[in-house]
Amino acid sequence: MAVKCFSLYLILAAIVIGGVTSEYIEYNTKPRIVPEKINVHLVPHSHDDVGWLKTVDQYYVGSNNSIRGACVQNVLDSVIASLLDDENRKFIYVEMAFFQRWWRQQSNAKKVKVKKLVDSGQLEFINGGMCMHDEATPHYIDMIDQTTLGHQFIKTEFGQVPRVGWQIDPFGHSAVQAYLLGAEFGFDSLFFARIDYQDRAKRLREKTLEVIWQGSKSLGSSSQIFTGVFPRHYDPPEGFTFEINDVSAPIQDDPLLFDYNVQERVNDFVAAALAQVNVTRTNHIMWLMGTDFRYQYAYSWFRQIDKFIHYVNKDGRLNVLYSTPSIYTDAKYAANESWPLKTDDFFPYADKPNAYWTGYFTSRPAFKKYVRDLSGYYLAARQLEFLRGRDSSGPTTDMLADALAIAQHHDAVSGTQRQHVAADYALRLSMGYLQAEKLVASSLSFLSAAKSSTEKKNPGTKFQQCPLLNISYCPASEARLLSGKSLVVVVYNSLGWKREEVVRVPVSSENVIVKDASGKEVVFQLLPLSEIALRIRNEYVKAYLGRSPRDTAKHVLAFTASVPPLGFSSYVISDTGRTARGLSASYVTSGSMNQNVEVGQGNLKLRYSEEGVKITRHLSTKNQVTAEQSYAYYIGSNGTDKDPQASGAYVFRPDGVLPIKSKEEAQLTIVQGPLFDEVHQELNSWISQITRVYKGKNHAEIEFTIGPIPADDGISKEIITKLTTTMKTNGTFYTDSNGRDFIKRIRDFRTDWDLQVYQPVAGNYYPLNLGIYMQDKTSELSVLVDRAVGGSSLENGQIELMLHRRMQHDDIRGVGEILNETVCLPEGCKGLTIQGKFYVQIDKPGDGAKWRRTFGQEIYSPLLIAFTEQEGDSWINSHKTTFSAFEPSYSLPKNVALLTLQELENGEVLLRLAHLFEVGEDSEYSVMAKVELKKLFHNKKIREVKETSLSGNQEKAEMEKRRLIWKVEGSAGEEVKRGEAVDAEKLVVELVPMEIRTLLIKFDDQIEMVGDKEQQHRL
């Protein structure tokens, strides 16, 4: 019977296959758009994280694959080979940190072939930054810099200009990304995947996933950009992924093989496409053919895409083509559709009811501060590199630029990487700093060179710097001064206006005085180092350097430095051999703070009592505002069996809040002096703070020390501070967008949909990079921060900041590691302690913007301090002790910031100027500003000025000619008139509120005077 059945099967098989042969099939994949059909744009891509579970280099070479089998080198090798095989295939690439690594390893012959692929459009660079930066935790200057670095590489090597923004993975999207990192780069469109699940559901219903996004109220319609949100994630529809180990069924089109399924797979494709058509406008849809670290064996993808294009087009119901986001954008524009207008931003982001991705606004606060500190340092170092003259053979800022660029990645500064990856980012930053530190020292030595060229040439000054000043460690200032020697302190100001600011350095002796370069004694203040400060200093110097401090600093010396714009001043610290007059008066309160203590002069007071610290500002005789400061911690949720969502590196899910009260025998140390008063307060064994008020200033500075956060009880803790007032704020507050624009927030409200509130705390948290403020009819309270943090106003008249986090559970978002930072010493490891500052000012309504904008610049760009010793007055008498790059008495207007002054490799100089104020923000400063380039570069002759896009990769005029003007539903508002083109004779730059202008400048060769010494400087 079995033989008969088998014979029958052979007969039937012969009938089925009879006349059919297996042969080569030439797939027709020639791209075309068919107006009368649904056009499906297939976009092959690989999303390559510049560090996350593995380090950037491990991801590139494919090492440490026990964590994840990912090798970007294989992706690029494989993709390029596949593109060369078929001219119809296309691929987009985004992360230049990886492509740059791959590019420098290629032969000249391979480079020629790749350039042809780029020129033909087969390989297109999208976004084009070194990484796909985060949008919540970076400062806008860092976002500009990292993108510029990638764009310069693309322009230099390929002569190309990216057209599309591609922020597919960041966890929420900022207004600054839309208008500044989009429209101002000359991008025609911006695409991403992650928006709030409630927002997505509404947009799917209403076909509003694609919009015109107007991110700036100040720049209006001139800064709009077409924006597309993907219907699902940034991967293909289910059943269409084709990496080697993926489970999607391939098209099997050989009739001699089993499982022939062409029509079945064509039907699957058509069904998925028609489903997407139902949620978007026009007859064009885009499929993302790829996801994380795909195309390691690119043939497995391209073979299937070839087949789908061939057979679906042959079927005739749809038109399918290899495409790119640029081609897709052009097709959308050609459709002449009107699009909804989107304003504000896409924060906060939640992917489930109890999963708000707002914890990462604060995660890894020490790393966030390190990035911010080095960002400000890099800005100053580039200026000094320009003033000295770029020397490619010596130390440069290039390594720091690269490390900072990578650190802006959405799993880097965000704090959402694994611990060993965080250490790798920090190491790269440290190595970059060491190179930039040498550059800064040599530049200051050059600029302060001998006053007279006729004098005997001095050897270059060896300047020392102190990167650990934040923990009161500075070998240069702590060293005991031998007889006849003194310490020269050179203070550099990277801002465009004069600064008078208190400088603080640790010293070992109390017998010191401070003089300016003319020999005039300067008012100073000498403070004892607290026990807490000494403990932190000793522990963390040992942790960082592997050894304890050699010297024992006993005091902090503070004096006011007066520094010209884009220049330096010099001061001299000497040991007099007798007790200094500047020793601060200090005393300690006893008992349990049962008596009221008041500190401060003028109209700003600090009051301490059993209730805590109160900051009071007298705005007038009848208007007094008091803000009471306190600490608390949220208990991070561990999740439940029903809903396992826990608080973690990404997600903030609180499960209650507990106040942190001062211990019963808490003491206050009050320090008073001629420059400032401060109060030291130890709340418990792991939280202490210093509250400081400066003479002549209207803000309070709160310096906090938090850690190690106790973990023995198994409770996740998220540490917050609150400022509570009686202001009637009606649920309204304002937070910055990447340190630039301020956006109005209303508690439990979203502009674009009716919010269903499941997490009333986490769902009202927003990212802060500059600060947060609230106001009512009588007053305005502003808080500025020194790094990226999360913040909110959860009750009327109250502001809170999240400062530190230590978790006990992972939040199931892929990192697979608990956020539990520790510091390790030979005697063991313990939780990380962080130090930081925030600043509080109370103003009349509408008056706070001036302080937020100008003081915010001082926070971002602290004074740069360098030290050298001298014998007698030898250095002061033989060097230039003060310097400004500007024409004497000239400074930038207070509403303009100098963002970038950088000499490029080709000798051109990149200059960025930014208006700091928004429209209507301040009656005095929200107006057009003018900058005179001749006075900025008064000792150089400007030969040519060319205005460019924000990244400097194309002329502004050409960019504007190509700009797509989209139709908007309803009113798009008036287009804002920007500053006039720079006249070649007058050389005046005009800036309207929130405008940033980028210029490439060429100078004539000339003899210029630097430090009264002639220098031939070719620029």
Swiss-Prot record:
Coiled coil: none
UniProt-listed Pfam families: Alpha-mann_mid, Glyco_hydro38C2, Glyco_hydro_38C, Glyco_hydro_38N, Laman-like_dom
Example GO biological process: mannose metabolic process
Signal peptide stretch: 1-22
Cellular component, GO annotation: plant-type vacuole; secretory vesicle; vacuole
SUPFAM superfamilies, per the entry: Families 57/38 glycoside transferase middle domain (SSF88688), Galactose mutarotase-like (SSF74650), Glycoside hydrolase/deacetylase (SSF88713)
SMART domains named among the record's database cross-references: Alpha-mann_mid
Keywords: Disulfide bond, Glycoprotein, Glycosidase, Hydrolase, Metal-binding, Signal, Zinc
Role summary: Liberates mannose from p-nitrophenyl-alpha-D-mannoside in vitro.
Name listed for the protein in its UniProt record: Alpha-mannosidase At3g26720
Organism: Arabidopsis thaliana (Mouse-ear cress)
